[in-house]
Amino acid sequence: TPEVVMVYSDKGLNGMSQAYHRLYRDRLMRGKWRNHARPILLNNWEATYFDFDEEKILNIAKKAKEVGVELFVLDDGWFGTRNDDYQGLGDWFVNKNKLPNGISGLSRKIEEMGLKFGLWVELEMVNKNSDCYRAHPDWLIGAPDRFESHSRHQHVLDFSRSEVVDFIYDSISKVIEESSISYIKWDMNRYMSEPFSRGASAADQGKTMHKYILGVYELYTRLTERFPDILFESCASGGARFDPGMLYFAPQTWTSDDTDAAEREKIQYGTSFVYPIVSMGSHVSAVPNHQLHRTTPLSTRANVAYFGTFGYELDLNLLSAKEIEEVKAQVEFMKEHRDLIQVEGDFYRILSPFEGNDTAWMVVSRDKKQAVAGYYERLNKVNASWMRLRFKGLDEDQLYKVKWEDKCLKAYGNELMYAGIPVDRDYCNKTNGDFHSVLYTIEAED
């Protein structure tokens, strides 16, 4: 019988979400990273895709260090013959043509810069153009003598078989042991089809999918026990496997491969109904966005990404001097407020992106002394009506100082929650444009 997770709330959907957040954050997540703020990272995927070598990676990492980033993550393309997505999966040994000093040499150079090093893997998958497949063609999920569906040019390894799990465990453990790795992003970029195991009898084929996920859990268990300090992030073409079972092993999940800030408002708003902020992978990416070709302000991209694990997925060397200074300020802001946002605060949804043009949410400390709120306007409008942003979760009798942009006001909690504060509108369409956002910091006054 499948397990069910249920909570009770007498404070509406925000109360329900906070109960889930505390349950998962305090009781489901394990180890070193339970109730621990996340490092600010830079991932090279949208900066380079498969086209990189050691020099290019080190140049990106050097710039990341300059702006205050703490963790550099090397994504897909570092192993086997992985120069595109047609080949290489299953061969978990370094591509020496790209990285002549190996992952061990690269990770040491990254650490010498003062950064931690992270690595992307997709351990459950295999390409037919790989040494792994050529040696073990029967390790694929799929019936013999029938067509084996591929997706992204890849196939699923049969993790219902212990020898497959053992092989992958030995392969990736060797890479980790030889290197200095602080973070692993574990991806899964296709669904399972034709669920037939060539290692099981006809009578046991109905157990294949269940035994497969038990094999995934087994590999996670062995890796997390052997390498307890590594921060694991799960991923499945984004958030396709965002569930409590995975959070037990990996305390954060890449929420979506869609990194567009406007889309992320809906994605992160919806995810927040059940999953805590600290579990939601969120990055500032380049513009035009690589998924939608939409351009959003750098400030808005950060203002959305703050409410997650926070990081960057772009080549900082391509930014202007002004943008670099803005990124430095963003990193400083997140370092100052990440304990509140990710670990110590309660999350409140205020305005739904599914119900109008505006989105708003906030995080309030348990003692109600501090809060950070985000407001996002999707499309600019001519002669838009006046509106007030009404905060939630504050102490009605407490005097607060609210800061945003170059403005500041003082008001009691009941005023801020029931009357709210006016939202600045750009009535002449001269400055804000589409996808404008405002970040508010709220602090109790003595």
Task: Report the location of each language-model feature.
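Flexible loop/turn segments at secondary-structure boundaries
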Residues: 9-12, 48-51, 79-85, 124-129, ...
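Catalytic cores of secreted or luminal carbohydrate-active enzymes
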Residues: 299-351
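C-terminal beta-sandwich/jelly-roll accessory domains of carbohydrate-active enzymes
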Residues: 379-446
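Carbohydrate-binding surface patches
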Residues: 353-396
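Aromatic-lined carbohydrate-binding/catalytic grooves of carbohydrate-active enzymes
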Residues: 33-167, 183, 193
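Short Pro-Gly-centered flexible turn/kink motifs
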Residues: 1-10, 435-442
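Active-site neighborhood of glycoside hydrolase catalytic domains
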Residues: 100-102, 134-136, 140-297, 309, ...
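Conserved, mostly hydrophobic/aromatic
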Residues: 42, 72, 110, 168, ...
